[in-house]
């Protein structure tokens, strides 16, 4: 999978390639990440990428010419990409969208800056995507969030089991995790995790996931389609709640 980013701050985005799972995936050629500097596609000695808005108003607007020069170069070099513009006006970035984008072979993420991008650039854009209902100074951080999330669904980047068991892929929040020591500051690891009974461990983990989801994300709980393990875990939760009331 190829993911490319167009930005005026390439050094900021390059960091995503240097650490952890993403770094290893790049080194093993599981994913290819290319970072391009929009200023390299300007035509003046000052490498200008912005100008004053027609009609007046605060701030600057990113000029269209560098984007179109870059896009022509990119298509000739790598083929036509699925082009994303980071934008607070876009679709909300969530797990379903992550899965959808992970199936694309050639992604291009355009990072906005200033007051926005000349509207004519939208001819090149397939998707506007927002990582939340708030405004950032630029699209570089959203681009890095997208790269990290999308890469995890690319085959071979992390284990299939890890992807399946992560929060949101099951429709629930993750269960609590524990490691050594067995007791710390008077707090013990739940006994069920030490007994080696995998069925009981799975049931406990599902019960904890359901409990956490009910408490923190009831919206997810209400959308969840429950399987048999969920139903058994919910019954246990209900019994515990009744016993606590008693």
From Swiss-Prot:
Keyword Coiled coil: no
Annotated binding of S-adenosyl-L-methionine, by residue: 112, 131-136
GO cellular component, one term: cytosol
Any Gene Ontology biological process: tRNA N1-guanine methylation
Reactions catalysed according to its record: guanosine(37) in tRNA + S-adenosyl-L-methionine = N(1)-methylguanosine(37) in tRNA + S-adenosyl-L-homocysteine + H(+)
Keyword S-adenosyl-L-methionine annotated: yes
Alphabetized CDD domains for the sequence: TrmD-like
InterPro entries on file: Alpha/beta_knot_MTases, tRNA_m1G_MeTrfase_C_sf, tRNA_m1G_MeTrfase_TrmD, tRNA_m1G_MTases_N, tRNA_MeTrfase_TRMD/TRM10
Gene3D superfamilies given in the database record: 3.40.1280.10, tRNA(m1g37)methyltransferase, domain 2 (1.10.1270.20)
A Pfam family per the record: tRNA_m1G_MT
Annotated EC: 2.1.1.228
Record localization: Cytoplasm
EC class (word): transferase
Main location: cytoplasm
Molecular function terms from GO: tRNA (guanine(37)-N1)-methyltransferase activity
Keywords: Cytoplasm, Methyltransferase, S-adenosyl-L-methionine, Transferase, tRNA processing
Superkingdom as given in the UniProt entry: Bacteria
HAMAP family in UniProt: TrmD
SUBUNIT field: Homodimer.
Family classification: Belongs to the RNA methyltransferase TrmD family.
Its biological purpose: Specifically methylates guanosine-37 in various tRNAs.
Protein name, per record: tRNA (guanine-N(1)-)-methyltransferase
Origin organism lineage: Bacteria, Thermotogati, Thermotogota, Thermotogae, Thermotogales
Gene name tied to this protein: trmD
């Amino acid at each position: 999978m190829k993911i490319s980013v167009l930005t005026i701050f390439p050094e900021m985005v390059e960091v995503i390639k240097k650490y952890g799972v993403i770094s290893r995936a790049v080194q093993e050629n599981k994913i290819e990440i290319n970072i391009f500097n929009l200023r390299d596609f300007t035509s003046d000695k000052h490498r200008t990428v912005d100008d004053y808005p027609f009609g007046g108003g605060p701030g600057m607007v990113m000029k269209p010419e560098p984007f179109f020069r870059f896009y022509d170069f990119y298509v000739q070099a790598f083929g036509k990409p699925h082009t994303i513009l980071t934008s607070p006006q876009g679709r909300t970035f969530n797990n379903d969208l992550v899965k959808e984008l992970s199936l694309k072979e050639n992604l291009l993420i355009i990072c906005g800056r200033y007051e926005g991008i000349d509207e004519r650039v939208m001819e090149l854009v397939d998707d506007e995507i927002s990582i939340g209902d708030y405004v950032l100074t630029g699209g570089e951080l959203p681009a890095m969030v997208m790269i990290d999330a999308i890469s995890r669904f690319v085959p071979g980047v992390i284990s299939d089991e890890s992807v399946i068991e992560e929060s949101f892929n099951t429709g629930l929040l993750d269960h609590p995790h524990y490691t050594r020591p067995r007791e710390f500051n008077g707090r013990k690891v739940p006994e069920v995790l030490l007994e080696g009974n995998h069925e009981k461990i799975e049931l406990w983990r599902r019960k904890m996931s359901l409990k956490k989801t009910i408490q923190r994300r009831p919206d997810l709980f209400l959308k969840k389609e429950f399987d048999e393990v969920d139903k058994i875990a919910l019954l246990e939760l209900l019994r515990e709640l009744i016993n606590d009331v008693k």
